[in-house]
Amino acid sequence: MGYIGAHGVQTLHRYKYSGVDHSYVAKYVLQPFWSRCVNFFPLWMPDVSCTEVSLFTSLRYHAVAFSLFPELTDNFIGVHVMYMCPRPNMITLTGFLFLVTSALLGYIYSPMLDSPPPRWVNFAHGLLLFLYQTFDAVDGKQARRTNSSSPLGELFDHGCDALACAFEALAFGSTAMCGRDTFWFWVISAVPFYFATWESYFTNTLVLPVVNGPTEGLMLIYLSHFFTSLMGAEWWGQQFGKSMPLVSWVPFLNEIPTNRAVLLLMVAFAVIPTVYCNVNNVHKVVKASNASMPRALAMIYPFVVLLGGVLLWDYLSPSDLMKNYPHFVVVGTGLAFGFLVGRLILAHLCDEPKGLKTNMCMSLLCLPFAIANALTARLNDGVPMVDEFWVLLAYTAYSVSLYLHFATSVIHEITSALGIYCFRITRKEA
């Protein structure tokens, strides 16, 4: 059974992306930079097919004819370049792989994310995140440059962004020695992301405010990486009042570790206001259309259960999962989150009825078993029925399998419906 029905296929053909970025930093600083960067990406990609080889051979032997008839050159090169042009999804995927590399560096040099890695690793985290942001912005420009925008591009782009929340949380956890709090840094990136996706489903436009995560948020993070490469990761472990003397007068905050203080400040001044605006905007749309707000809120249910289930599992766990296995917890939950976001985006692209999508709950399938296994430890002198490492490994493997099945299936269905390829700009033969 596929993910896209007949109505969805029809909708894909007429879907148009709508998004607005009100960030002044993006408008006056980064957009000009990104516009220059896109010119570094070629409009061509070598292929090894016989047709390509013959075209290059023809191009070489007909150089004289092209010089005599320049209009022939324009037509030939125009058609040929479009045939070999790499689809922007390749740029998106490359940017995402930068963050996977960053997370792997963190795992190698700080396996439990509670010890300082070499300072060059902090610098590498910052550089790789900067490259991710650049590639993530340039892919859309490349799509417009090559006239290859498609619903698949939006799903691919935002799908990679959803997974990026997990891998960058691990990279930042390495830099700031967050330890078990690394999961919470993933949460404060995942919550606004999910609510923004949910909002765009109802408003049909992705609106980024004057200060937003993809621009100022990422900039703040990679600047933090660069700062740590100079100051050392120990800066994040000392009391906030010592790290920031100007706020040493603030009670409570000045006595807790800097990384935890930053976490609380982000929740108070970034996450809560953003989510409030998202819910308020959806409420306006629902009210104007005389729809049901509880039905709209039901689409948040799987995400809330995912977070609640993982937190309950960790609370009951005798193994302290988030401390001993932070990478497995974040990657497993991050991929389950990626499935939820991808399913929500697909519902938007295909104009599905608003409300809970039951197959979104597939991402929650392992949690009841994991929680039950943790409970058995309370009946067996602290020893669970199954070693929690293997349960966590199974949870992560299931999340990986679920996401890969969803991603490959949907890519196949969309490319078949639209007659395109995922990583190459050329029409499929009928």
Question: Can you annotate each of these PLM segments?
Answer:
Residues 1-44, 48-49, 56-85, 189-430:
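C-terminal membrane-associated helical module and adjoining short loops/tails
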Residues 108-109, 174, 349:
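Helix-loop junctions at the membrane-solvent interface of multi-pass transporters
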Residues 35, 39, 43, 62, ...:
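Short helix-loop boundary/capping segments at the starts of domains
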Residues 46, 87, 91, 136, ...:
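Structural signal for hydrophobic/aromatic residues that build the beta-strand cores
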Residues 58, 96-99, 161, 225:
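Residue-level recognition of pore/gate-forming positions within transmembrane alpha-helices
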Residues 142-217, 221-222:
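Histidine/cysteine- and/or acidic
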Residues 54-55, 75, 79, 92-154, ...:
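Membrane-embedded alpha-helical segments that form the functional core of polytopic membrane enzymes
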